[in-house]
Amino acid sequence: MASFRGSIWYCIFVLSLIAVAISAAESEEEQSSVLTLDSTNFTDTISKHDFIVVEFYAPWCGHCKKLRPEYEKAASILKSHDIPVVLAKVDANEEANKELATQYDIKGFPTLKILRNGGKSIQEYKGPREADGIAEYLKKQSGPASVEIKSTEAANTFIGDKKIFIVGVFPKFSGEEYENYMSVADKLRSDYEFGHTLDAKHLPQGESSVTGPVVRLFKPFDELFVDFKDFNVDALEKFVEESSMPVVTVFNSDPSNHPFVIKFFNSPDAKAMLFMNFNGEAADSIKSKYQEVAHQFKGEGIILLLGDVEASQGAFQYFGLKEDQVPLIIIQTNDGQKYLKANLEPDHIAPWVKAYKEGKVQAYRKSEPIPEVNNEPVKVVVADTLQDIVFNSGKNVLLEFYAPWCGHCKQLAPILDEVAVSYKSDADIVIAKLDATANDIPSDTFDVRGYPTVYFRSASGKVEQYDGDRTKDDIISFIEKNRDKAAQQESANGKDEL
C-alpha cells in the first residue's frame, strides 16, 4: 500500500511540474513583445498596421533559434520607440500556415518581410541579425523614405565618404518630379539612403547654379557623384541601380566590396570577369586597360568584374578554370553561354571584348578531359564527348547526371552497372554518366536541378526524364518503353522486300 501511495504522489509531483512548465511557457508567450500570427489572424492583423515586420520561421531551424532572443529583444526596444514598430512571427512549418509561406515566397528560414500600408507594400528585410542592429535598421525603415536636408551640417551627417547616398534637389517639395522621386525612394529604401533638399549649396560638390529638379547620387568610387534629370519612375530606378555599381567591380578579400559583388552577379547583364594575380608584374597595366574597356562599353549590356586569383577559387572551380590560364577573362551571358580568353596581355582586352560584342568569339565549354579508356559497362561522358556519344551516335542513351559527393548517386551507381551489363549484347543501347559539377550541360535539352538526374534520349532524338523508382527492373522497363527500334524495323522491312 505504501508503495502504491508513493507512486500516486510521484505522478502528482510530475504532473505538477508539467503544469508549472506549461504555465511558464504560456506566461512567456503572453509577455512576449513579438506577435504570434497564423493563418487565422494574419490578414486581419497586417491590415491594421502601416508598418509591421514578420519573421517566417521553422521550429527546427538552427538560425531561427539563434535569431529568436535577438528578435525578441529588438521587439522590446522598438515598442517604446517614438513611433512604435511591431514585430511578428509565423511558424511557416505548420501545415495551416504553408499557404502564407507560398504567398510571401518563403524559400528558407528565417525570412523577414517588411509590410507597409496594411500589407500592400512588401519588402525584404536586409538589415543586421542582432538586437540593436535590428532596432536601428527598423527605426530608419519605419521613418520617411527620404530625409530633408536643410543645412551643410545635415548634409555632412547623412552623406559619408564611404557609402552611397541619393539626394533629390527640387525648387519645391511638390509636383510630378518630386512625387516620382519619393516613389522610387520608398521602393528602394531597403537598399539605399535618400534625401531631398531645396538648395544644392548644402551638398558636397554642390553648385549654386543647380536649382533642380535633379537627382545627385554620391558614391565612394569612380567619379564620386553623378547627376540625373529624367524623373520617369523606371528610368530613375534604373539610374540608381546602375550608377551605384562601380564601373569595374573588385572581387577580393575586402568585405566592403562584397555587396557590390553580390549586385554584380544578380545583374541581368552579360558578365565579364577578369581574373589575375593582383601582385603580378603586369597587374597595373591590366587594371588600367580593363578600366578603359569598362568605360568604352558602359551601358551596352555588359558589366565588368576584376577578381584576385586568391579570392576567386570558387569561381575557378565553377567555370572549370586553371591558374596556369591566368590572367584570363571569361564572359557569361544570361542564357549560360561562356566565352574565354586565357593568358591575355593588356592589349588583348579591348579587341577581344569588341570581337565578343560582334559575335566573332567561339563559345567556351567547361569539360573534363576525354577519358583515354572508356570500357566500363557505364560509359563516361564529358562535355566534349556529349555530342558524339549522346546526340550523334544514333543510339538509345540513358544518361545519368551526378555529383561525386552525392549519396543518392553512389547508391544508384551499382544499379546502373547492372542495367548496363543487362544490355551488354544490345548495340543500340548505351548506359552513360556525366559529372555535372565538372562539365557544362546544355540547359535547353536537360533540366538538371538536383542529383542524380537521369534522362533517356532515343535514337531518333526523343528526350524523356526518368522519374521512376531507382531499381534495375524499373529502369529497364523505362528504357524498353522509350527506346527507338526503327533501325531493327528497317532491317526487317529490307528482308521482306528481297
From Swiss-Prot:
SUPFAM superfamilies: Thioredoxin-like
Function recorded in the entry: Participates in the folding of proteins containing disulfide bonds, may be involved in glycosylation, prolyl hydroxylation and triglyceride transfer.
Coiled-coil zones: none
Domain Thioredoxin: from-to ranges: 24-143, 339-484
Top EC group: isomerase
Provenance organism: Ricinus communis (Castor bean)
Residues of the site described as Lowers pKa of C-terminal Cys of first active site: 129
Pfam families noted in UniProt: Thioredoxin, Thioredoxin_6
Cross-referenced PROSITE patterns: ER_TARGET (PS00014), THIOREDOXIN_1 (PS00194), THIOREDOXIN_2 (PS51352)
A single GO cellular-component term on record: endoplasmic reticulum lumen
Signal peptide range: 1-23
Name by which UniProt lists this protein: Protein disulfide-isomerase
E.C. number(s) listed in UniProt: 5.3.4.1
